[in-house]
Amino acid sequence: MGGVRGRTGHLAWYRTDEAADDVAFLHGFSDSAQCWEPVIRAMPGIRALAIDARGHGESGLPDEPIRYTAHRDDAALVLSSRPRDGGVVVVGHSMGAMSAAYLAASRPELVRAVVLEDPPTGAPGNHQDEKWSEPDWLAGLRALDLPARIARGRADDSSWPDDELEPWAVSKAQVNPHLFDLTFQQPIALTELLASITCPVLLIHGDTERGGLISPEYADDCARAAAGEFRAVQIAGAGHSVRRDNRPRYLAELTTFLTTVEART
């Protein structure tokens, strides 16, 4: 990704330029900030920030439990280092989407609006720190060299645009293996977070039959729970990585949402 690269504490980030950010992008588990490059490149003129999550990309990994409150605080640390009046639009995928929801619920001064691409649903109640381990699929990918990882991605997801494959493949080798020596805490219910989010929310999801995490029924639950303006969009034929499975439709929904938010400021 071109533009400006830097660090805030243990976190690595990428900005399109030195100007104030319009949109901040938070990636999913085992991805990196660079995985947002195809989307950012397809939106000329956008002033974007993309952050490597702890233990991912070029970010460091503090020796402490992996919790969504930590991901929230990491994003807040970077955003508050160059605050923008009224906040920025935060776009997240999967783990990054849940992190964005945590951030919007507790730091509204930093978030103007939020886009959630197929976040986990979470679960109600208080969760304890638990041991976890590296998923077999990730270990298998990390054992391959880069060309083989790219080939595996192309074979498994033949509909993805070619420019998605290399950053996806590179990111897998960047996951810090010490991540799995730390404990992990499951997130609270997404509906609980939405009840505390007052800014506009766009939920983009695919089909559960293709691996999507959000069903139409759960999207309806989210709409009922949301404290602020809320819209859910299901992109038929897409799975968990909605933007990779159907980039044109994803970009159309994202661009319309950003234009609407900008028109209100």
Question: How should each PLM-predicted stretch be described?
Answer:
Residues 229-265:
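Catalytic active-site module of serine/aspartate enzymes centered on a nucleophile-bearing elbow/loop
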Residues 15-61:
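Conserved HGGG/HGGXW glycine-rich cap/lid loop of the alpha/beta-hydrolase fold
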Residues 40-41, 49-91, 238, 252:
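Active-site loop/oxyanion-hole signature of alpha/beta-hydrolase fold enzymes
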Residues 205-238:
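Conserved loop-alpha-helix segment in the C-terminal half of the alpha/beta-hydrolase fold
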Residues 125-129, 141-199:
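Conserved alpha/beta-hydrolase catalytic His-Asp/Glu region
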Residues 92, 96, 100:
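Gly/Ala-rich beta-loop-alpha elbow adjacent to hydrolase catalytic centers
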Residues 101, 105, 112-143:
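Flexible "cap/lid" loop of the alpha/beta hydrolase fold
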Residues 6-16:
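A short loop-to-beta-strand scaffold at the N-terminal edge of the catalytic core in hydrolase folds
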